[in-house]
Amino acid sequence: MTEQRMALVASPTTAAQEAATELRAIYEWHPIERADLVVALGGDGFMLRTLHAMLDRHRILPVFGMNLGTVGFLMNDWKPDLLELRLQQARAITVLPLRMDVETVEGQRHSVPAINEVSLLRETRETAKIEVLVDGRVVLPELVCDGVLVSTPAGSTAYNLSAQGPILPLESSLLALTPISPFRPRRWRGAILPNKNAISFRVLDAIKRPVSAVADQREVRDVSLIRVGIDKTSPLTLLFDPEHALDDRITMEQFAV
């Protein structure tokens, strides 16, 4: 197998920087511009920033993460030894990001990628009133809530989970549609949709009840219309150790207390 050129990126935390120093003393590293893959040291948040940086540069490489953060759901165990062999044996999982297209009440338009989720949030003490459409069909004429989000499998253990949304297997072709503190309809607790569906939101009474739209950490305020769908033009690749029990972690996360 041809030797792959590795680039190293690390979170600014002390643990990640110390690990990076250790790896630099053992292996040969290359700038991202000349690399074939990226080794990322940190937690899930740093992995998210690494993937967004590649989307911004329009140069997308496979990423092998090692956990030096807290949860590390998208990361492998930290081990400095035999890294090149681990990379050769790694299992690749494709993650499709979301694309959020929004229009504001003033007519401005924005298009923003999201890897974890797109969330709509009320901006004031007034509850949001939102019409929900799937593939152009109105499925909820009026959702009264603090907000609502669309999550990818990669993001389903993050904000989605804290909003009582379902955990989705990382390799599934599904999206979670999860309300945030819903008031009406009282019995609606969300939906699981095929990722081929296009999801749209119309903000009702957007002047009195302003809503912001957030794609991961990128916010657009005072929105009126939001369209969310999978972006198949920018697939991301995460690399995992063959023994990485991802399915087991997904299962056990649902019973965490």
Swiss-Prot record:
Keywords annotated in UniProt: ATP-binding, Cytoplasm, Kinase, NAD, NADP, Nucleotide-binding, Transferase
Localisation per UniProt entry: Cytoplasm
Role noted for this protein: Involved in the regulation of the intracellular balance of NAD and NADP, and is a key enzyme in the biosynthesis of NADP. Catalyzes specifically the phosphorylation on 2'-hydroxyl of the adenosine moiety of NAD to yield NADP.
Cofactor list: a divalent metal cation
The protein, known as: NAD kinase
One Gene Ontology biological process: NAD metabolic process
GO MF, one example: metal ion binding
Residues binding NAD(+), per UniProt: 44-45, 49, 116-117, 146, 154, 157-162
PANTHER family: NAD KINASE
EC numbers: 2.7.1.23
Origin species: Rhizorhabdus wittichii (strain DSM 6014 / CCUG 31198 / JCM 15750 / NBRC 105917 / EY 4224 / RW1) (Sphingomonas wittichii)
Membership in a protein family: Belongs to the NAD kinase family.
Disulfide bridge map: none
A GO CC term assigned to this protein in UniProt: cytoplasm
Positions annotated as active site in the UniProt record: 44 (proton acceptor)
Catalytic activity: NAD(+) + ATP = ADP + NADP(+) + H(+)
Enzyme class label: transferase
Domain of life of the organism encoding this protein: Bacteria
InterPro entries: ATP-NAD_kinase_N, ATP-NAD_kinase_PpnK-typ_C, NAD/diacylglycerol_kinase_sf, NADK
